[in-house]
Amino acid sequence: MADLKSIVAEKLPLTMGETIALAKEYGVRVVDVVLTESELRTGLDREGVLKAVMEEYAHNLKAVEIGVSGGNSFLLGTVPTQLKEMGPGTIFSDVLLDKALMYTVAAEVGNHCIGVRPCAGTGDPCPYTGFLRALMDVGTDETTLAEVACLMLKVGSLFRVAKVTTGCNLEGYGAGSAAIAAATVHLKNGTPA
């Protein structure tokens, strides 16, 4: 059997179905296939990919902090600050879920305050960032955080391609939901089998 990297190189770019099929065939995690594809497309090694991905989130993580620290949005007011004051576990009775909600809305509010970057106002980076920030709060290690970020971006990028080719806005919470579902499966050690 050919090595994974050479097979991925032949098929670039990979669909999600191809990504899952290769993970199953080679007995690796889906994120390992995503990272292999990223290494080939960027020329970076795995650590370089993980570092670069987290650097892309720096702006939105700053937006989250503004959003939960009194940021005020023309659309959402001060909802994240109010959620923070209520404390985790009060909306869904689940700390991680409450934090993910709070930080997702905080990313939106913060971006309304400081300007939207790198997204074009489509909303998909806000759920990704909210979920990552919640994972940070519950003590998820840096490597796992970066792997989750890569996986969410892979799923989200497929929605962006669909938007470009169909003209339909498939991003926003649609991409966010699918990306976070994939990330949750990864975090729970789910497999393609």
Where are these regions (language model features)?
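N-terminal Rossmann-like FAD-binding beta1-loop-alpha1 element of flavoenzymes
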Residues: 183
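N-terminal core-entry segment
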Residues: 2-177, 188-193
